[in-house]
Regions:
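Alpha-helical membrane-anchoring segments
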Residues: 1-378
Length: 378
């Protein structure tokens, strides 16, 4: 009996967590922003997809189609005659997804097409961290309730219906009714898993050696920056490689280091200043790892979630300034996941509490009184 009661409470809590209805609907805004950012970045890097139609013969041995490309039998590389039609399809569905025209099919097709692009990059040894997460978020949006808010589809649906009762403001009509929160919560889970696994990878593969700050030193002291003098080897491997591990390239290369693309002399100097003091760089390394390992704070409500999302934005801002890797998509997603109406509602209460505390210190015997009454200091 006790087990059944506990099970019911647990299921009730899960049901309330994922399926409670809320008017906080950031999914429509996320649907508008992410396809625009994603399509812009793809156009910046590939324009009309011609860069996906060849393999560099000099690096041919480093190119291996990913498991998904093999499983689905997708073309690799993309055939030249398909490049422009694929590009047109990609940018058109991105626009439809952002506008909310054929919203759910457009999001689904755009998400799958982005995964295909990510997989081509992975096959060439480059993992696109931004697009890999965003493509998953797009697929969630394609089925989650609330993602059609602020869309052309919703506007056309509203205009086609005969209004009954008092008319609502247009923005409220476009926002739509309260919807279950499971889509929003699922995106939070994806984001939490992304940050958490990043922290686990640092501990698993780097251990204490990562926490000593030497990896960050390599990134920030100019060793990985093409804008500073000297050679910048990007592919790395252990000093003593067993012969059986040299099968792919003859060297046993197993990973590569990130490049620091920051060309600003000012931010280069800031990076040098940080790395010049071992304590600073160690604090940065430890703080970043602990922050990522605490990612499941995103599943909590209230200030823990808000503070973590703000911390994530700050972390990406720092990486953007120091390495010119701003992860704009992540920053936008974190910003839009914050319930700013809740934050605004909480801040005045905090300010009032602070004022009351200060008043008690300044005026002995001060007591707050209800609104409409006369304040009395005894």
């Amino acid at each position: 009996m006790e087990k059944q009661l506990a099970s019911r409470k647990w299921m009730s809590a899960l049901n309330a967590y994922f399926f409670e209805k809320s008017r906080f609907q950031p999914l429509g805004l996320i649907r508008i922003v992410l396809p625009i950012l994603c399509a812009y970045q793809v156009f910046r890097d590939y324009e009309w997809m011609q860069g996906l139609t060849f393999i560099n013969p000099a690096l041919d041995k480093l190119h291996e189609p990913s498991m998904l490309i093999k499983l689905l039998g997708l073309p690799f590389p993309l055939a030249p005659e398909y490049a422009q039609p694929f590009a047109v399809l990609y940018y058109v569905v991105a626009g439809c997804a952002a506008l909310g025209l054929g919203t759910r099919p457009a999001l689904f097709i755009f998400g799958l097409a982005t995964i295909y692009l990510v997989d081509i990059d992975v096959s060439r040894g480059f993992f696109n961290h931004e697009a890999s997460l965003i493509s998953q978020v797009l697929l969630v949006l394609s089925v989650a309730p609330g993602s059609t808010s602020f869309s052309v589809d919703r506007l056309l649906g509203t205009l086609s219906k005969q209004p009954s009762g008092p008319q609502k403001p247009l923005w409220r009509v476009l926002a739509g009714p309260p919807v279950p929160a499971w889509g929003y919560k699922l995106i939070l889970i994806l984001l939490a898993c992304t940050y958490f696994t990043a922290g686990v990878s640092k501990v698993r593969y780097g251990g204490m050696e990562w926490l000593d700050g030497q990896t960050l030193t390599h990134y920030l002291d100019g060793s990985a920056n093409p804008y500073t003098p000297g050679n910048k080897p990007m592919y790395i491997g252990p000093p003593d490689v067993p012969q059986q591990e040299k099968w792919k390239d003859g060297f046993g290369i197993y990973t590569y280091s990130y490049g620091n693309r920051q060309g600003s002399p000012f931010w280069q100097k800031v990076g040098h200043f940080i790395t010049a003091t071992p304590l600073y760089i160690q604090v940065f390394a430890i703080a970043a790892t602990l922050f990522e390992l605490c990612a499941f704070a995103l599943l909590l409500s209230g200030w823990p979630r808000v503070l973590y999302l703000l911390g994530a934005i700050l972390m990406h801002k720092s990486i953007g300034f120091l390495m010119n890797l701003p992860f704009i998509d992540y920053q936008a997603l974190c910003f839009l996941l914050i319930d700013w109406r809740w934050v605004v509602a909480q801040v005045p209460a905090g300010v009032k509490t602070l004022v009351k505390r200060q008043a008690k210190r300044v005026v002995p015997g001060f007591r707050a009184v209800p609104e409409g009454a006369t304040s009395v200091a005894q």
